[in-house]
Amino acid sequence: MSMQDPISDMLTRVRNGQAANKVAVKMPSSKLKVAIAALLKAEGYIVDFAVEGEAKPELEVTLKYFQAKPVIEQLKRVSRPGLRVYKKKDQLPSVMGGLGIAIVSTSKGLMSDRAARKAGLGGEIICYVA
C-alpha cells in the first residue's frame, strides 16, 4: 500500500521519536521533506539532518532536547491532501503569539510565516511548529 501523505508521516515520526526520547529518526527522503528539515534546523527546532543512500535515499533527523524535554512541543499538519489550506500574505497565522512558526509553501519555496510576511507572499500552510 502506498503512503497517502508523506509529510504527515514525517511529522508523526518526529513526534513519536521525541516522545520516546530518541536521538534521531529515519524516514524516506524527498525534496519537500529535506526543505522542511532545513527550515526546522534554521529555526532551531532540530540539531541536524542528513540524507543517506543513493537508490532509496533516507532522511535522518537529529532531534533536539532542552533539559531533557523536547524542543518541539507541538507539531501539527494543517494543509493535507483531502483539505488544502491556502492563505494570503495578510492572513498568515501567528503560531502561539509569534513563539512558534507556520511552515508555508510559497512560489519562492518553503519558508516560515515571518519570512513569508516579510517577503509579501502567501501560500499553502504546511504545518505549525511550536
Swiss-Prot record:
InterPro entries: Ribosomal_uS8 (IPR000630), Ribosomal_uS8_CS (IPR047863), Ribosomal_uS8_sf (IPR035987)
PROSITE patterns, per database record: RIBOSOMAL_S8
Short name of any one Pfam family annotated for the protein: Ribosomal_S8
Complexes and interactors: Part of the 30S ribosomal subunit. Contacts proteins S5 and S12.
Gene: rpsH
Keyword Manganese tagged: no
Entries under Gene3D superfamilies matching the protein: 3.30.1370.30, 3.30.1490.10
Family classification: Belongs to the universal ribosomal protein uS8 family.
Functional summary from the UniProt entry: One of the primary rRNA binding proteins, it binds directly to 16S rRNA central domain where it helps coordinate assembly of the platform of the 30S subunit.
GO CC aspect terms: ribonucleoprotein complex; ribosome
Any one of the GO BP annotations: translation
Domain of life of the organism encoding this protein: Bacteria
Keywords for the protein's UniProt record, in alphabetical order: Ribonucleoprotein, Ribosomal protein, RNA-binding, rRNA-binding
Protein's UniProt name: Small ribosomal subunit protein uS8
HAMAP family attached to this UniProt entry: Ribosomal_uS8_B
Regions that span the bilayer: none
